[in-house]
Amino acid sequence: MPGKLVSKISNRKCFTLKAIDTVKTASSRLHENHVGCMPILDEHQKVVGIISERDLSQLIHSERFNTNLTIDKIMSKNLITCDLNTSVTELMELKTDKKIRHVLIMEENKLKGVVSIGDVVNHLINKYKEENKSLRDYINSY
């Protein structure tokens, strides 16, 4: 497990939004694409933030709620990133330390993807299934 890299566990298409998109657009795009977050890009395609279902949920319960509000007003700007060579172990530590579910994968200041807690869990499930099979095969060989 420690040797497995982020580049091997995150291979879904990365959907993005523009900072000028509305809350309504963000909500629709998250729903349509079955994702829990989307990075936000500026007019130069630079990542300037991230918005998640949690951000939208918090907004709905605030006095500022308005579906026409632009997402640059509510996006998280404190970006937590990793690179393609980050190990799964390092990624799990980062997610735990920062109490986050999504980490942006960046390489040379370019967005390469997003790795979610679900990606990590699926990786671990597959890892343990393989390990379980190997142990059963070993035991049954005697």
Which residues does each predicted region cover?
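Conserved beta-strand segments that form the floor/walls of ligand-binding pockets within enzyme
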Residues: 39, 104, 116
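Acidic (E/D-rich), amphipathic helical modules within compact regulatory domains
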Residues: 28-62, 71
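The conserved cystathionine-beta-synthase
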Residues: 17-34, 41-44, 81-99, 106, ...
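Short hydrophobic beta-strand segments in globular cytosolic domains
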Residues: 47-48, 106, 111-112
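Tandem CBS (Bateman) regulatory domains
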Residues: 1-12, 52-81, 85-96, 117-142
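A contiguous, well-structured "functional interface" segment within a domain
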Residues: 1-36, 139-141
